[in-house]
């Protein structure tokens, strides 16, 4: 497995245990088995991805305003883009998970793909340093970033316009939980739209959680209309 994914991502781990941790779904972890899963690495990878994408856009678009750069960054780190990259490297087939999670379609679950990809970035960062993580991100994001001629809309805006076109009420966002320490909280937000299943998502701030929830709701709407 390690050799196969290393060829795809064009990076060889010096410490294979980091890769194993990045690909271990929480469902596989118990007191009697593995100690770690990908959640800690996911937290780290999210931060690394954001700084690399920010620097990438800063260099590619020297004349862009802060607002335009922020919109572009949102599009490049949103759930849809993470899933796109994860699917391009067949990441789902490498995620180790419980039989129950796998039976429920875990290898194709968008949230699992997003989390594992961010964990993979975190693992590369710890194993090879910032430059190694930067090279990986540039490999899979630079083309998309370079061709962003028009600042994209964020997921909440796209969802708002979509439901308006369907003559549905505006999406309703509710914060249903806040956990973790004050210096590093995790917010759980739920978005509701009539005729669709409510969607929950988490983030390190309410804005990020709402964007993730909107992105997941967009996926649900698109899948339902196929």
UniProtKB/Swiss-Prot annotation:
From the UniProt record, list the reaction(s) this protein catalyses. Answer: Endonucleolytic cleavage to 5'-phosphomonoester
> Which cysteines are cross-linked by disulfides?
none
Name the cofactor(s) required for activity, per the record. Answer: Mg(2+)
Instruction: Domain (DRBM): give its ranges.
Output: 154-223
| Domain RNase III: from-to ranges | 2-129
- Look up the domain of life of the source: Bacteria
Pfam families attached to this UniProt entry: dsrm (PF00035), Ribonucleas_3_3 (PF14622)
Q: Where does Mg(2+) bind?
A: 42, 115, 118
Single annotated GO MF: metal ion binding
Q: What is its main location?
A: cytoplasm
Keyword annotations of the record = Cytoplasm, Endonuclease, Hydrolase, Magnesium, Metal-binding, mRNA processing, Nuclease, RNA-binding, rRNA processing, rRNA-binding, tRNA processing
Q: EC number(s) in its UniProt entry?
A: 3.1.26.3
Task: Tell me the SMART domains matching this sequence.
Answer: DSRM, RIBOc
Report the CDD domains cross-referenced here: DSRM_RNAse_III_family, RIBOc
GO biological process assignments? mRNA processing; regulation of gene expression; rRNA processing; tRNA processing
Q: Where is this protein found? A: Cytoplasm
Annotated active site = 46, 118
Annotated Gene Ontology cellular components are: cytoplasm
* HAMAP family found in the cross-reference section: RNase_III
Task: Give the protein's biological function.
Answer: Digests double-stranded RNA. Involved in the processing of primary rRNA transcript to yield the immediate precursors to the large and small rRNAs (23S and 16S). Processes some mRNAs, and tRNAs when they are encoded in the rRNA operon. Processes pre-crRNA and tracrRNA of type II CRISPR loci if present in the organism.
The family database entries (PANTHER family) matched by this protein are listed as: RIBONUCLEASE 3, RIBONUCLEASE III
Q: What family does this chain come from, according to its entry? A: Belongs to the ribonuclease III family.
**What NCBIfam families would the database entry show?**
RNaseIII (TIGR02191)
Instruction: Fill in the subunit field for this protein.
Output: Homodimer.
- Return the protein name: Ribonuclease 3
